[in-house]
């Protein structure tokens, strides 16, 4: 049971109907609110519809039932699109010529299928967190809580998870199939947008496919370190320390480059560490999900801003920006910072910011800020904690941190943190796998440059090209170039309380520069010498090669199916009986990881285990009925893998066979040895 809770393919029909309405509504909006070309409207309409569907579902989910939360946004999109088409009163509502893009749609289906095959065979990257979010959001916990009945919601960018949650609620899917299908859908659509964007800038079909290939495959070039003299790599062993999961390789850096990466849930043919990257992994490896959605929104914004048409496009753009904040606040903030930086530079050089459509876009971005602070997600919860002090003293202490900005930098260092940021000294290139690589250490600097990839050598030319195009009217390129520079430099000079998290800023910078380099290479009017143009092509080829190796590695997982990390057919069977059927106010005991995922009901702390003093640990070691009742649990979930690990004395003394205990649901394997069981304790005094 990988796909459906009831095993019936027809269960998907309500979701397909909702998505048809989303696509049709998005197509209408793309046609009548923006000045798009015929070959762009259908695909951009699907992306626009999905992004706005996510935003509406998040807003409605605060108050409405799960069924309405995931159904009503589709109808609203269709209604708004129809009203906008009716108000225009000129030309057809939709142009049948838009359907000539059908070969691209077939290519998109192929891309979705390939990524789905990879995802079905892999259980990588925050699997528990993603499955839990999809499950509880599909069951109506919006915004998702961190603990049951706890005032602080989960601090996370959960926008991506609405697509998977809709597949569970409307499509009858299980958590793992909903997760994999939502990733695959957005990944394929993301590459179609990249292809259309490349087609627009290059003016030829090959430009579209080249841009899509770069977005999918481009990565850092750590593997090129293997070409350096052995003596250099031995020097690197002394100053480069592996971080996180990479440290489990247990070898010096020089040997780790040609070693498998020991990650749980990886493909049968393991990833080679030398082809991975701690700054820019290829998008073929984007199995966590939110980064796919963030790139899709970036490309959508890139598409729509030059094609605004009236107040409706302004309002829709504000909603898209707000969804971006919900999908990945880091890249959203980086784009806004790029707008501010570009505005300042333009005003300084020209004395004004009179550029086509610049002020409406700036207003849409400004409108999205207060929405982002109240709609839910990371920014909302950080703002709530800052003001109300749910996890600390609140505004008073936080305000003190802001005052510290006015003090000299040498006093700041090691004394104050501002919103989790502090100065980094010495400056360094930050890699999630290799840590901070100091700019003042020649060996670390060289390793860091290879980690970034050869794109870094072409940034002056990319910036010059983008700025010239910006001054000629395509100012969005100037904003993107500015945000890319900020994304590179902020992690170099500032560190964060969770330092590896801000490596995402550098990832965004490298992605933007790589896309722009494709456009620069294709622009024959740009004054490059021939050897520079050929060198840029070679640099793109070297960055794409690493992604090709990763993609080839993942094909070894295409023939396998994994339900989820640690889940099997019994878990799927009990989920079919339990998901969405427990009372909303019920308190449920069980292994926090599986109980939440399989029932859609938050059974405890969403991420990680509770502190050692929590009674949950006592109950897991000895689930005594009297203690469960005294802790006001209504249900107890029993997994035979956990139950059999208890001593016979504990099992006999637990009292879970009392008359008052009823079995709500139970499944066994064919050997009648392994089981999953949900016990109803509500009748016990």
Give residue spans per PLM region.
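Membrane-embedded, hydrophobic transmembrane alpha-helices
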Residues: 1-95, 483
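Membrane-helix boundary/interfacial segments in multi-pass membrane proteins
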Residues: 13, 62-67, 122-127, 151, ...
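Start-transfer (signal-anchor) and selected internal transmembrane alpha helices
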Residues: 64-116, 205-212, 359-363, 539, ...
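Membrane-interface helix-loop-helix junctions at transmembrane boundaries of multi-pass membrane enzymes
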Residues: 91-100, 306-313, 348-361, 457-484, ...
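Transmembrane alpha-helix segments characteristic
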Residues: 104-108, 313-323, 362-365, 467-494, ...
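Active-site lumenal/periplasmic loops and adjacent helix-entry segments of GT-C-fold
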Residues: 109-297, 561-565
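Hydrophobic/aromatic-rich transmembrane helices and adjacent perimembrane loops
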Residues: 184-188, 289, 333-339, 497-528
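Extracytoplasmic
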Residues: 470, 523-685
């Amino acid at each position: 049971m990988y796909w459906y809770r009831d095993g019936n393919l027809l269960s998907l029909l309500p979701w397909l109907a909702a998505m048809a309405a989303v696509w049709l509504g998005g197509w209408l909006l793309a046609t009548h609110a923006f000045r798009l070309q015929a070959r762009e409207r259908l695909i951009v309409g699907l992306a626009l519809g999905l992004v706005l569907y996510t935003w509406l579902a998040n807003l409605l989910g605060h108050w409405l039932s799960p069924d309405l939360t995931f159904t009503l946004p589709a109808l609203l999109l269709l209604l708004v699109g129809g009203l906008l088409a009716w108000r225009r009163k000129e030309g057809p509502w939709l142009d049948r010529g838009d359907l000539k893009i059908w070969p691209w749609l077939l290519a998109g289906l192929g891309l979705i299928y390939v990524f789905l095959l990879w995802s079905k065979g892999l259980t990588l990257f925050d699997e528990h967190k993603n499955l839990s979010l999809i499950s509880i959001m599909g069951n109506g916990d919006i915004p998702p809580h961190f603990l049951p009945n706890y005032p602080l919601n989960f601090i996370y960018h959960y926008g991506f998870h609405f697509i998977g949650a809709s597949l569970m609620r409307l499509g009858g899917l299980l958590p793992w199939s909903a997760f994999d299908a939502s990733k695959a859908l957005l990944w394929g659509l993301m590459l179609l947008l990249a292809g259309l964007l490349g087609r627009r800038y290059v003016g030829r079909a090959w430009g579209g496919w080249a841009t899509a290939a770069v977005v999918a495959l481009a990565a850092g070039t750590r593997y090129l370190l293997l070409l350096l003299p052995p003596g250099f790599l031995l020097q690197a062993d002394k100053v480069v320390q592996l971080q996180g999961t990479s440290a489990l390789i247990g070898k010096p850096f020089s040997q780790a480059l040609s070693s498998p990466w020991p990650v749980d849930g990886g493909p049968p043919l393991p990833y080679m560490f030398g082809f991975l990257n701690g700054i820019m992994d290829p998008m073929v490896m984007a199995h966590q999900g939110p980064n796919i959605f963030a790139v899709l929104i970036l490309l959508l914004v890139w598409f729509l801003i030059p094609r605004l048409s009236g107040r409706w496009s302004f309002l829709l753009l504000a909603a898209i920006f707000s969804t971006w904040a919900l999908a990945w606040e880091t890249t959203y903030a980086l784009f806004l910072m790029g707008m501010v930086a570009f505005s300042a530079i333009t005003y300084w050089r020209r004395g004004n910011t009179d550029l086509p459509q610049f002020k409406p876009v700036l207003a849409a971005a400004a409108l999205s800020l207060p929405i982002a602070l109240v709609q839910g997600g990371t920014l909302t919860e950080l703002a709530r904690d800052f003001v109300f002090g749910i996890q600390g003293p609140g505004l008073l202490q936080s305000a003190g941190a802001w005052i510290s900005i006015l003090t000299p930098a040498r006093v700041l260092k090691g004394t104050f943190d501002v919103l989790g940021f502090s100065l980094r000294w010495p400056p360094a290139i930050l890699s999630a796998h290799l840590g901070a690589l100091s700019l003042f250490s020649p060996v670390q600097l060289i390793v860091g440059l290879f980690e970034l990839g050869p794109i870094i050598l072409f940034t002056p030319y990319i910036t010059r090209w983008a700025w010239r195009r910006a001054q000629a009217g395509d100012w969005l390129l100037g904003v993107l170039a500015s945000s890319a520079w900020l994304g590179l430099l902020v992690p170099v000079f500032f560190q964060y309380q969770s330092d590896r998290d801000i490596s995402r800023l550098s990832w965004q910078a490298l992605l933007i520069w790589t896309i722009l380099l494709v456009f620069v290479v294709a622009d024959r009017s740009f004054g490059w010498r021939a050897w520079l143009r050929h060198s840029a092509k070679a640099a793109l080829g070297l960055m794409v090669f690493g992604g090709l190796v990763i993609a080839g590695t993942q094909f070894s997982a295409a023939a396998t199916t994994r339900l989820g990390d640690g889940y099997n057919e019994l878990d799927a069977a009990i989920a079919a009986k339990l998901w969405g059927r427990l009372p909303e106010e019920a308190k449920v005991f069980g292994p926090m990881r599986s109980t939440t995922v399989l029932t859609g009901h938050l059974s405890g702390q969403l991420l990680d285990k509770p502190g050692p003093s929590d009674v949950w640990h006592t109950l897991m070691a000895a689930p005594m009925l009297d203690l469960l009742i005294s802790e006001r649990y209504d249900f107890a979930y029993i997994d035979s893998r956990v139950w059999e690990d208890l001593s016979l004395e504990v099992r006999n003394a637990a009292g879970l066979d009392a008359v008052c205990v009823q079995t709500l649901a139970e499944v066994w394997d064919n050997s009648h040895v392994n089981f999953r069981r949900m016990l109803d304790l509500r009748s016990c005094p």
